[in-house]
């Protein structure tokens, strides 16, 4: 045996050892197995549904749709979000384990779309409710654009540090909105201490200026049938 060459056993052992960090290994495992929670309310979600078919086959990216937010690490919002649906979306996001990601798909999700021009009940941007990682514009976006958004999210995950992602979420305050679509700073919802209620107004008050109190103000006396439609 040539003394310069390594024995076959040593060469095999060297080729089988991976030198990496725990953070890089965690990022690699997460970007290769994203489990999305699909939150579709309008026509944009039909475009996403085509990804499940054999033509695009999004399973090759490791995406496994989940029906429970506690088993998902990615929520994909598609379609119009109304104020009545806002607490449900925030609740689903809060039930997802860390680290978690959000893709906003379509113009209606990002800005409210054409429905926000003369509607008091449309949320003008889902980023007023939950932090968004990737914005995917379009009306509706093509399936190829959805794949590109997922690819960009995978690249973002591969470069992040877990501690740096968790720390700002725990320290920053959250942007909430009022019933007249004005920004308001409140306690961070990522700590689980966000206010979980609706500040509702009777129908007669929508003809006048609405006070700038927080939209997510807890009122235990308000029942579900009294919420703003």
From Swiss-Prot:
Family: Belongs to the complex I 20 kDa subunit family.
Domain of life: Eukaryota
GO cellular component entries: chloroplast thylakoid membrane; respiratory chain complex I
Localization annotation: Plastid, Chloroplast thylakoid membrane
UniProt-listed GO biological process terms: aerobic respiration; electron transport coupled proton transport; photosynthesis, light reaction
Cofactor: [4Fe-4S] cluster
Annotated NCBIfam families: nuoB_fam, PRK06411.1
Pfam families: Oxidored_q6
GO molecular function, one term: iron ion binding
SUPFAM superfamilies registered for this protein in UniProt: HydA/Nqo6-like
Protein name as catalogued: NAD(P)H-quinone oxidoreductase subunit K, chloroplastic
Catalytic reaction annotation: a plastoquinone + NADH + (n+1) H(+)(in) = a plastoquinol + NAD(+) + n H(+)(out); a plastoquinone + NADPH + (n+1) H(+)(in) = a plastoquinol + NADP(+) + n H(+)(out)
Quaternary state and interactors: NDH is composed of at least 16 different subunits, 5 of which are encoded in the nucleus.
Membrane-related topology note: Peripheral membrane protein
Leading EC class: translocase
Gene: ndhK
Keywords, comma-separated and alphabetical: 4Fe-4S, Chloroplast, Iron, Iron-sulfur, Membrane, Metal-binding, NAD, NADP, Plastid, Plastoquinone, Quinone, Thylakoid, Translocase, Transport
Residues that bind [4Fe-4S] cluster: 43-44, 108, 139
HAMAP family, A to Z: NDH1_NuoB (MF_01356)
Note describing how the cofactor binds: Binds 1 [4Fe-4S] cluster.
Principal location class: plastid
EC number: 7.1.1.-
Protein role: NDH shuttles electrons from NAD(P)H:plastoquinone, via FMN and iron-sulfur (Fe-S) centers, to quinones in the photosynthetic chain and possibly in a chloroplast respiratory chain. The immediate electron acceptor for the enzyme in this species is believed to be plastoquinone. Couples the redox reaction to proton translocation, and thus conserves the redox energy in a proton gradient.
Organism: Coffea arabica (Arabian coffee)
